[in-house]
Amino acid sequence: MKINSPLEAYKYLPQTNCGECGQPTCMAFASTLIDRSGKTTDCPPLIKEKKFAKKLAELDRLLAPEIRQVTIGVGERAANIGGDDVLYRHKLTFFNKTKMFFDVADNMDEAAIVERVKKISDYKKFYVGRNLLLDGVAIRAASNDPAKFATAVKKVIENTELPVILCSFNPAVLKAGLEVAKGKNPLLYAANKDNWKEVGELALEYNVPVVVSAFNDLDGLKTLAKTFAEAGIKDIVLDPGTYPTGKGLKDTFTNFLKIRRAGIMGDTEIAYPIMAMPLTAWMAGIADPVSASYWETVLASIFTIRYGDIMLLHSMEPYATMPEVHLAETIYTDPRSPVAVDSKMYKVGNPTADSPVLFTTNFALTYYTVESDLASNGIDCWLLAVNTDGIGVEAAAAGGQLTADKVKDAFEKSGFDLKSDVTHNSVVIPGLAARLQGDIEDKLNVKVMVGPMDSGRLPGWMEKNWPPKK
């Protein structure tokens, strides 16, 4: 993005404040363009009226991310990679979380392919209010046989809606896979210095994204990318090679940094998403599969943090996948807006009029920790999430985001009446918000009980203190 102020975007807008975009003013809409919560297509006059055509084209150019965004696959599960504007998250945010593709090989028997594909497709890990998923399937042409590869590709796409990567350096094999995967927008892996012409022709013929590959040769990689761009191929992914150990790993790390820095600083010839291959850990001579999985996870972690936009992985063991998906979720959390849940009254279990009423803040990690501690111990209760702008209990109580007035307002907005909806007219407050006890009692005219400092101690606290003494 070449502009960073709403004022700069505003001058390319109709400036009529028509409200058709859903914003009250064109300046407000300009703000959504800068923070990337809105798109130029959200402004009907800008799109429909010919007099704005030049302004629209220039605005689109100025708003385009420094790193090109590439889409793999189709439909709801299509994977967007790239699209970043900064080297460091705190300067804006990172967009398009690192996509994780897990491999299958065409020399596996059909039942094994189907089983692995279903395992990849069905993977789900609940974390802070959302399900973490895997992103796609990389189909390796281990046989180097076009017919066998086509059969494997057909079997994969019949059993998943996830996007796929077709992996071979043999153009004939890739063509066989493309014929089967027509309309699925697969990613081609890969074009190198030996096959670039044939693979480039395939990318143009089938209109699919393609990886250009030059191991530890950034000049060669840039030349390939430039050649493909000049040929009219826009959706390019860079593979500088991923060496799993020693000096090769150090060089790989440095190459990722150089590529991304050059792209962000304006070198459009190499401003494309980067592919990492942590599965090379399995080629590092590590005999023990657990140790190989561990090292693969280490590599995945390194390149999630340092600009890997898409990864090819092998191990599906929980001890490998859980750190990988958790880290990606954490790194790609938007620092401009803390992860928060809706501020409202939630039911935990099957509460009744005799069940306890508690509150916490709407910071997602806090809320789901408390909710989990209550639910896992079979405590049926009412749990209110107070709007603290996504800040945890202790910080919100200290900073003024959690006050007696805020708690009262949250109860009123939730429609929950402590006098009629429960029989005990009591509220349990977090131990870290104990300073608010008196104020809450005055504001709500209820009995306030100070709970433990840690929600993990709630079961023991409930045994001793609930129901409240009359």
UniProtKB/Swiss-Prot annotation:
It comes from Methanosarcina mazei (strain ATCC BAA-159 / DSM 3647 / Goe1 / Go1 / JCM 11833 / OCM 88) (Methanosarcina frisia). Signal peptide: none annotated. This is Acetyl-CoA decarbonylase/synthase complex subunit gamma 1. It is an enzyme of class 2 (transferase). One of its GO terms (biological process) is acetyl-CoA catabolic process. Binds 1 [4Fe-4S] cluster. Keywords: 4Fe-4S, Cobalt, Iron, Iron-sulfur, Metal-binding, Methanogenesis, Methyltransferase, Transferase. InterPro entries: 4Fe-4S_dom, Ac-CoA_synth_d_su_TIM-brl, ACDS_complex_subunit, AcylCoA_decarb/synth_gsu, AcylCoA_decarb/synth_gsu_arc, Dihydropteroate_synth-like_sf. The lineage of its organism: Archaea, Methanobacteriati, Methanobacteriota, Stenosarchaea group, Methanomicrobia. Heterodimer of delta and gamma chains. The ACDS complex is made up of alpha, epsilon, beta, gamma and delta chains with a probable stoichiometry of (alpha(2)epsilon(2))(4)-beta(8)-(gamma(1)delta(1))(8). Pfam families: CdhD (PF03599), FeS (PF04060). [4Fe-4S] cluster binds at residues 18, 21, 26, 43. Gene3D superfamilies: 3.40.50.11600, Dihydropteroate synthase-like (3.20.20.20). It catalyses: 5,6,7,8-tetrahydrosarcinapterin + methyl-Co(III)-[corrinoid Fe-S protein] = 5-methyltetrahydrosarcinapterin + Co(I)-[corrinoid Fe-S protein] + H(+). Disulfide bonds: none annotated. Pathway: One-carbon metabolism; methanogenesis from acetate.
